[in-house]
Amino acid sequence: MWLYYLQVVMDMRVYVEGYGCVLNTADTEIIKNSLKKHGFEVVNNLEEADIAIINTCVVRLETENRMIYRINELKNLGKEVVVAGCLPKALKNKVKGFLHIYPREAHKAGEILKNYVEKHYRMPYIEEDINKTLYKKLDYLKPSLITPLPICEGCIGNCSYCIVKIARGGLISYPREKIVNKAKELINKGAKCLLITAQDTACYGFDIGDNLANLLNELTQIKGEFIMRVGMMHAKNAELILDELIEVYQNEKVGKFLHLPLQSGDDEILKRMKRGYTVDEFKDIVNEFRRKIKNLCFTTDIIVGFPGETEEQFQNTLEVLRELKPDYIHGAKYSQRKGTEAAKMKQIDTKIRKRRSEILDKLRRELSYLNNKKYIGKAMKVLVLDEGKGYTDNFKVVKFEGGEVGEFRKVKITDAKTFGLKGELIL
């Protein structure tokens, strides 16, 4: 069927849907804009499309299964399907017979598809060449009220459970000048919130003699009223630049939001996960942030049921969480991922994982509500996202009446819910 489309790129309509993290969300937009540049019409309605591109996530087994189900669903609807993102890179054999677009090729999506349609030729994937100009992904970002801003690709970790490293590879940081120039462009064209994103923002620059604190400091000097949310950091890398990081966090343009995954509150499990820090080292980072950054919103991730995790080790995790009281906990049952070291370890019964997940969910709700109650009576700066909703300057969701989209307003918090706040405009 592909040959039917020879020489008719200008008439072709492409539907794109994406899944996964903020970094993948950015890639989905990059794919769309690359397609437009190369003459394709991007449509929002699947029924109108000749081709469907699915930008996949593969972080968990159930996510992988959902992706494969959706791919087959699109195929059965009679669409030509292109599989992009982490799934084809990490588990190529699972999606044989489809055209693939890998994470580091998102900005080349239009060129790849055009070549395939017109010549039935798949451009070779030469990662060394792609890595040299990977920063050109930034050229395909367009402004919106909230805009993801990727700063690097890959990471320097080697966590024993993680398939994303297989999909996204080692660290390639974008030049600071390129990021800052793109941020200026986005803000000048109306962006009010930049989501600074990467697999691990804390390792930014380690490969090019730079670091995240330097980047953030330069970004804060951009003129205009805007706020940045710094994405997930690995604790072992954040620790290396901790003092500089906390200093730049005191700038009003840096949201008081810290996403620092703990994963386990037991040192033996952390060692087997290859996380590279101890529980005490993790606590020290969080406590130092809280000591110097007022109203810090601390978010963390926890994996329950990691291979070999005993009941005592699980209880150790709960105890650490009760002590640190994160504002929000992303809890997940351990997922066995092909090609990872942890997949070869002795696995825990799924019923035990499920029970521990339920216990964690109850605790995370309790802690979230406990934290949110502290804000009742406080006046907070809020970015209005849409009618009746906004982000506080530490990225809690607050509901209120009034305000124009894109404005920064003062809101007094009047009530707290488990995962959000209520308030009223005062300025």
From Swiss-Prot:
Transmembrane segments: none annotated. The keyword Acyltransferase does not apply. Disulfide bonds: none annotated. [4Fe-4S] cluster 2 binds at residues 155, 159, 162. [4Fe-4S] cluster 1 binds at residues 21, 57, 86. The keyword Iron-sulfur applies. It catalyses: N(6)-L-threonylcarbamoyladenosine(37) in tRNA + (sulfur carrier)-SH + AH2 + 2 S-adenosyl-L-methionine = 2-methylsulfanyl-N(6)-L-threonylcarbamoyladenosine(37) in tRNA + (sulfur carrier)-H + 5'-deoxyadenosine + L-methionine + A + S-adenosyl-L-homocysteine + 2 H(+). It is an enzyme of class 2 (transferase). SUPFAM superfamilies: Radical SAM enzymes (SSF102114). GO terms for molecular function: 4 iron, 4 sulfur cluster binding; metal ion binding; N6-threonylcarbomyladenosine methylthiotransferase activity; tRNA (N(6)-L-threonylcarbamoyladenosine(37)-C(2))-methylthiotransferase. GO terms for biological process: tRNA methylthiolation. This is Probable threonylcarbamoyladenosine tRNA methylthiotransferase.
